[in-house]
A protein has these predicted regions:
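Bacterial N-terminal signal peptides that target proteins for export
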Residues: 1-9
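Bacterial N-terminal signal peptides
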Residues: 8-18
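Boundary at the C-terminal end of the N-terminal hydrophobic targeting segment
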Residues: 20-22
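Boundary/junction segments of secreted and surface-exposed precursor proteins
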Residues: 24-32
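Short aromatic-cysteine micro-motif
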Residues: 32-157, 162-188
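Surface-exposed recognition segments
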Residues: 194-271
């Protein structure tokens, strides 16, 4: 987005970024993020794991609400007033938006809010669409890594302030509820709670060893000890049951379609 050679196109891109609440010079990095995101390198990362909402009448009566979502300014009060419903307690919640991304345009939206349940049971394609409808995108694994830097690499989970890595609780917690689970840039729950989809794909691994003596975080990059024949989209951070395998270096791959739409996988968006 930043490597555009036409001055006219670069200006248009900058204006669009500014309209979405993220600002910066026409051909340079972003310098300000919406209130629901944190600065991370040259872009913005959502502060919280995504809460996916279905907005009724998104192009008519609720066009203003959709615009607030896209600007990163929609509050829980705004969403409730607009009749937006939260999705993600089962795979069926997202229908008619399908696991391969059909019928998702102008249907589901990803918001970054504190103290709500993050949405799970979502495929990579659905997460991609929810971000796109919200004028955002899935982050790359490299972008995710920058935003996660400084997050605690868990030991035991005390069940209150530590990252939600279990394995004793075994359920996701409300976004931002674990006050000690915050990165150097101010993003919450990047370790534990839900695994998070990122944009990158790799052949899915057959096992997930650690990083040797460097870290005990889960390491499932293709070729670690073997890979399967089906493609996988990368997930980061570990989940609510991962224990010491969770951490800012935790990486695995999962089927991007309905097979990967599990109760332990969510996502967050970037700009």
């Amino acid at each position: 987005m930043r490597h555009i050679f036409s001055n006219g196109i670069a200006l248009a891109v900058a204006l669009l970024a500014g309209a979405a609440g993220a600002t910066g010079p026409p051909s340079g990095p972003l310098t300000k993020c919406p209130v629901d995101a944190v600065m991370s390198g040259t872009g913005c990362m959502d502060k919280y794991e995504a809460s996916v909402r279905r907005v009724p009448n998104p192009t008519t009566a609720n066009a203003g609400l959709v615009r607030r979502i896209q600007l990163g300014r929609a509050s829980l009060t705004d969403l409730t007033a607009g009749g937006a419903t939260q999705l993600g307690t089962t795979r069926a919640d997202y229908a008619p938006c399908t696991p391969n991304g059909q019928s998702c345009a102008n249907d589901i939206y990803a918001v970054s809010l504190p103290v709500v349940m993050p949405s799970a049971h979502i495929s990579w394609f659905q997460a991609l669409e929810a971000c796109a409808n919200s004028a955002k995108r899935l982050p790359t694994s490299a972008e995710w890594q920058v935003a996660a830097n400084g997050s605690p690499d868990p030991g035991p989970d005390n069940g209150t302030t530590d990252c939600n890595t279990g394995p004793n609780v075994g359920l996701p917690t409300l976004t931002g509820a674990r006050s000690g689970c915050v990165s150097a840039r101010g993003a919450f729950d990047m370790v534990g709670n839900l695994f998070e989809w990122v944009a990158d794909w790799e052949p899915a691994p057959t096992s997930t060893p650690g990083w040797g003596g460097f870290s005990d975080d889960e390491m499932g990059l293709a070729g670690a000890t073997g890979s399967s024949t089906f493609p996988g989209a990368l997930v980061r951070g570990g989940g609510f049951f991962s224990g010491p395998l969770a951490g800012p270096l935790a990486i695995d791959a999962a089927p991007p379609d309905t097979r990967g739409a599990d109760d332990f996988i969510g996502f967050r968006c970037a700009r």
